[in-house]
Amino acid sequence: MTATAPHRRSEPVPAAAPGAADIAIEGASKVFGTGDGAVVALQDVTASIPGGQFVCLLGPSGCGKSTLLNAIAGFSPLTAGSIRMAGRPVVDPGPDRGMVFQEYALFPWMTVEQNIRFGLDIKGVARAEADAIVARIAGKLGLSDFLGRFPKDLSGGMRQRVAIARILALDPPVMLMDEPFGALDALTRRTLQDELLRIWAEYRKTIVFVTHSIEEAIYLADRIVVLTYRPGRMKRDLMVPLARPRDTASAEFNALKRELAGLVMEEQQRFTQAELTGSSVD
């Protein structure tokens, strides 16, 4: 399926940091199961993500956003097509990609400090160097006073800060984020969105961020890729034509929000109609 030509930005895309990785997705398809029970989650998705770009994958539940993200992470191989990062095929997880989940995925028996430094210890980073990295990252994310706490003692927002800090400590060129703020209240979500933008502006990593929130996608992303309902195909690929910082109350922001809402609702309605009639969504 051919994607609509991207909209033009009103601001240049900032330069990527040294080592930021391009991601090339070519004809990505994913089928779960076989025979009559087979489910086509993704179908022929093609996209090129330049290093340092912040991309949001947007669409209704079940459109294959997380499936595509898991394929980029190397967690789940494609049925057909390919994904390459910095020119190398993605076949399994690697240190060049860090994943942040909605469920935090922290080790409950470890302190905040131990969680942040876990990957550094696995890599065999010298203790003094690891101490310095943990202190620096914790300071940037407001965690310095919580290093001795355990995850159970933290709010959801603080736990997600720890999850992000653990990834930043390893300094991968790509950050993959699967609805990381979806379980948070509105105020905490906005605070962490701003924190993420600040971190991205400083480190300029390639970020692929899954969300079903249209407002979140517009607020965060350089670029938004809208996927169709199952099977997930590219419905629209657009650059966000708004300068940062973005005002969610502006006419331009809300015009784009209405446009994207129309696209997403169209896919939701197609699926609902297919469910009612028993026909295919194709």
Residue spans of the language-model regions?
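The feature captures the beta-strand-to-loop junction immediately N-terminal to the Walker
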Residues: 58-60
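Helix-to-loop junction immediately C-terminal to a conserved catalytic motif
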Residues: 73
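Conserved ABC transporter NBD signature motif
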Residues: 81-93
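Short coil-to-helix segment of the ABC ATPase nucleotide-binding domain corresponding to the Q-loop/switch region
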Residues: 110-118
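Conserved ABC ATPase "signature" region
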Residues: 117, 121, 128-146, 198
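Conserved ABC ATPase signature
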Residues: 150-154, 158
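A short, proline-enriched helix->beta-strand linker immediately N-terminal to the Walker B motif
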Residues: 169-173
